[in-house]
Amino acid sequence: MAESYLLDKLQSVEQTYKELTRRLADPDVTGNPGELHRLAKSRASLEETVNTYEIWQKSQEDLIGAKQIFKESASDPELREMAALEVAELEEKIATLEDQLTILLLPRDPLDEKNIMLEIRAGTGGDEASIWAGDLVRLYSKYAETQNWKVSLLSESQADMGGFKEAILEIKGDNVYSKLKFEAGVHRVQRVPLTEASGRVHTSTATVAIMPEVDDVEVHIDPKDIELTTARSGGAGGQNVNKVETAVDLIHKPTGIRVFCTEERSQLQNRERAMQILRAKLYDMKLQEQQEAVSSMRRSQVGTGSRSEKIRTYNYKDNRLTDHRLNQNFSLDRILDGDIEEVIQSCIAKDQQEKLAELAAAQETA
């Protein structure tokens, strides 16, 4: 590996890994569950890099040995041929390992391990847009099942003809944000609605927002900025005074963000859920502002996370999904069943390629 800066990074990672391993055996740490979990998680995040680096080091030693055998076997054509073959195989293996290590050393998004709130809003297209929003709720719920993630419906506004005007899902599990962060944007569908008698293709949209979950330490909300009213779970209004008002309608006055939460059984639980959603929305706004502030710096071609960015078109007639950031098509029927892993991995790969190109450019100018 010619790049000395990569070797320096790998040696630093290996040293950190060994130090974490040592600390995990410390009685003061083993007796502190919180600290033990934090250190174990940090160590686990470095394990793949360290293991790959060890394989690379061993392969380098093997390559030196194979080259030495090749050099000394001039009088033994058969042995020389075997040594030449081993040299070629090891050089190919080392090149692959170096590609893997370069990717493993890329800066990690600190949000990647977060759980998320996934908000889907019907866009243009009337009733069909709401039905499409409902289809996307099912798509992401099915995908979450394949990942062994836990999905909860936090808030919903159902449409008269089916689907949702708006729905917010909470998705919990391993590396949820890292996989779903590229889903943010406008999802356009082209299909013949069930209600369309003439068979004309309609175009509708739904907007997806991916909001990492945050706690009250990360986002401070002044209680004076909150306007909160309660209603029965069926919605505001009505005359049934005997039914407990469990629904919560919350407005954040500085931003105008409104959250209506009805899914929990008690008013207290709905209030906590509404505040949880509000924190995520405010944090998402902060992230969007930061992205705008660094517009002169790198912006991923895979997507800025902007809600106004059209990222995909789902064409039912041609059984085709087009991801406009990738300029790539996928089979639609699998996608609708929640099989979006190939699309997600393609987005991750493109993002990695961009980061690698940026890293190489930075080294050239250093």
UniProtKB/Swiss-Prot annotation:
Report the GO terms under cellular component: cytoplasm
Q: Which SMART domains match?
A: PCRF (SM00937)
Cytoplasm among keywords: yes
Determine if Protein biosynthesis is one of this entry's keywords.
yes
N5-methylglutamine PTM sites in chain numbering: Q239
> Which InterPro entries would you find in this protein's record?
PCRF (IPR005139), Pep_chain_release_fac_I (IPR000352), Pep_chain_release_fac_I_sf (IPR045853), Prokaryotic/Mito_RF (IPR050057), RF-1 (IPR004373)
What is the recorded post-translational modification?
A: Methylated by PrmC. Methylation increases the termination efficiency of RF1.
Query: Where's it mainly located?
Result: cytoplasm
Top-level taxon of origin: Bacteria
Q: Enumerate the UniProt keywords alphabetically.
A: Cytoplasm, Methylation, Protein biosynthesis
Q: GO: which molecular function terms? A: translation release factor activity, codon specific
Where, per UniProt, does this protein localize? Answer: Cytoplasm
Q: Function of this protein?
A: Peptide chain release factor 1 directs the termination of translation in response to the peptide chain termination codons UAG and UAA.
Give the family, as the similarity comment puts it: Belongs to the prokaryotic/mitochondrial release factor family.
What protein name does the entry list?
Peptide chain release factor 1
